[in-house]
Amino acid sequence: MLNYLCLMVRNLKNIPLNGNFGEVMKKINVLYDATVVCNILKNNSARSGIFFVAYNVLLEFLKRDEFNIFLYADDGGKLEYIIKNYSEFSDCKIYKYSLFQDLCNYVFYKKIDSKLNKKHFFAKLFWHILTFFLKFLDKIQKKYFVKVKDIDVYFSPMKAVPKFVLNNKQIKKYIILHDAIPLINDYRQNANHEWYFDLIKSINCHDIYFANSISTKQDFIEYVPKINSENIIVIPLSTGKEYVKIGDIDYINQVKSKYGIPLDKKYIFSLCNLDPRKNLIFSIKNFLRFVEKNNLDNFIFVLGGACWKDFENILNENIENLGEKKDKILKIGYVDDEDMSALYSGAEMFLYPSLYEGFGIPVLEAMKCGLPVICSNTTSLPEVIGDCGIKINPYSDAEMLAAMEKMYFDRDFREECITKGIDRSKMFTWKKCVDVIQNKIIGDIWGAK
């Protein structure tokens, strides 16, 4: 009997009440846009910063007793596949807006399943034609016929709110803003950024936006005047739980061998999508100056990450033009999640002189793994690194060279950066991130009742 009473008391603690004593507030029904989470099926640049934010925020949402989470994606078949094949999502519910959607999702799921199992070419072609037709009908249906019921909140970690939700004034909308890069660099003609400019068009003064840094918030206030600055709330991002400092040299060497990194070489590490704003040619040039000036023949520069197709030829051409020195530059491509910590932990330092960041997750990853960081003093990066590394002007060769020499030769300073970086990285957690989001949603929904 006593155990039963204790259980009742414990459960009552988790039941939210409003201002009237004893009146239980019902759970908030959240429709979560998991479109980008579906990139879990890919191993390329599609699984980069925004994907990991959407993925980890969703996992944290699913832990919260205050919410009923329903998933939505542009391609419901991918959601069906993920829920059936990824254990972390096995209890998730897909929001059903019509019987026709069930048919679409089943067909889309079968197409994915057939692709992943490498079935016959003509079978793939059949599924491709069928899904193209059904996607068209599904798009028409969502645009003109769907009425969303029993949803309190629509949460998007990336994309614009779809029209079938947008016109429902009863649903409160919340969107994460990641950066203003396409606005600043004017990517309007780039088809890959069509989703981004759809988002910009949809921004208004009523919905709530979560910015991943103070820098991102300020950029949206500057470049999107119609946004209400009071409706932008800054949230701290984090990394995957697998990012830790690894001391097992044998394991580190095993991972290095997997990516073709010579075991007898020290290496400086850079991990990012290989695109122009990451300032990689600047990094390569100054790395070579560093090793030549200091006669460090046993050093190489390891570049990890998927490459933009438009930039790949430019980067490769610059590396080829190095002549004999090109052997000091090693591109290892996309790095599997489980290998990240070992590669960070095995390096001498991390270079990230990016010209623009919305947040800068790789810097935080390096800090968590005990790797000292040299990064830009621009945009959001000072918010992440604090005083735990060296911040430089990303256009200054002199500052970059001096920073590399300081980090490598001053071992006391290096150890101080490692210790401070690990401590500071503990400030950034997905729990803190979603706590901010949850408090705002609960205040808006329950506070209005």
Language model: regions and residue ranges:
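Carbohydrate transferase catalytic cores enriched for Leloir-type hexosyltransferases
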Residues: 3-5, 10-12, 18-449
